[in-house]
Amino acid sequence: MEEGPAVGTLSREVSTEEAEPLGAAWSGDSGHVSQSHSSASGPWDDDGPEDAPGRDLPLLRRAASGYASSLLPSAGPRPEVEALDASLEELLAKVDEFVGMLDMIRGDSSHVVGEGVPRIHAKAAEMRRIYGRIDKLEAFVRMIGSSVARMEEQVAKAEAELGTFPRAFRRLLHTISVPALFRSAPSGPQRAAYEPPVLFRTEDHFPGCGDRPQL
């Protein structure tokens, strides 16, 4: 019965001696610093060299993730994607309108070349004939103008020779009989007979006018 307390005291001493080395191993007073890398330390806590492999890998992963989220379609609609779709739809609509306008212009061009050009050639030939008639008419008008100018010269000359008395007054003077005593001999030379100028004939320039019935 006396060995019980002694055995208990011995066991407590052994457990205390075993606990001291374990506590020294975990305490900071032992002089040994743990070289193990904490799992909580981040990638920016690495004090290795700059050209160490895998140093920029987290940055590259984050950049790739950002580009992927911007380019790849996501579950919900994104504002920039919707704006890009709207601009593409508007551009396609304008391209369709431009293509339709080109088709219309091409059709109009073929219509003009196929039908308009022959009609223009025919009208050009007709206009050349009309221009020839206009030239002939201008020459005819110039000839009439010269004839009228000659007639005006002869009328002015006749008025100067015969006087400007009215025709009725001259007839009245010619009807009055004057005695032979009061008649005087002609003082000047006798006037030559009147010769009318040569005028144009309308039939020479317009052949069909002579065949028309006179009204």
UniProtKB/Swiss-Prot annotation:
Q: Does the keyword Metal-binding apply?
A: no
Region (Disordered) residue ranges read 1-57
Record-level GO cellular component terms:
axon cytoplasm; BLOC-1 complex; cytoplasm
Residue spans with biased composition (Low complexity)?
27-42
Instruction: Cite the record's tissue specificity text.
Output: Widely expressed.
Q: Where in the cell is it found?
A: Cytoplasm
Q: Which residues form a coiled coil?
A: 80-97, 134-165
What keywords are assigned to this protein?
Answer: Albinism, Coiled coil, Cytoplasm, Phosphoprotein
- Phosphothreonine is carried by which residues? 164
Q: Does the keyword Coiled coil apply?
A: yes
GO biological process assignments? anterograde axonal transport; anterograde synaptic vesicle transport; melanosome organization; neuromuscular process controlling balance; neuron projection development; platelet aggregation
Q: Implicated in which disease? A: Defects in Cno are the cause of the cappuccino (Cno) mutant, which is characterized by a severe oculocutaneous albinism due to abnormal melanosome formation, and prolonged bleeding due to deficiency of platelet dense body contents.
Q: Which family does it belong to?
A: Belongs to the BLOC1S4 family.
Record note on quaternary structure: Octamer composed of one copy each BLOC1S1, BLOC1S2, BLOC1S3, BLOC1S4, BLOC1S5, BLOC1S6, DTNBP1/BLOC1S7 and SNAPIN/BLOC1S8. Component of the biogenesis of lysosome-related organelles complex 1 (BLOC-1) composed of BLOC1S1, BLOC1S2, BLOC1S3, BLOC1S4, BLOC1S5, BLOC1S6, DTNBP1/BLOC1S7 and SNAPIN/BLOC1S8. The BLOC-1 complex associates with the AP-3 protein complex and membrane protein cargos. Interacts with BLOC1S5 and BLOC1S6.
Q: What does this protein do?
A: Component of the BLOC-1 complex, a complex that is required for normal biogenesis of lysosome-related organelles (LRO), such as platelet dense granules and melanosomes. In concert with the AP-3 complex, the BLOC-1 complex is required to target membrane protein cargos into vesicles assembled at cell bodies for delivery into neurites and nerve terminals. The BLOC-1 complex, in association with SNARE proteins, is also proposed to be involved in neurite extension. Plays a role in intracellular vesicle trafficking.
Q: Name the chain's protein.
A: Biogenesis of lysosome-related organelles complex 1 subunit 4
Q: Which organism is it from?
A: Mus musculus (Mouse)
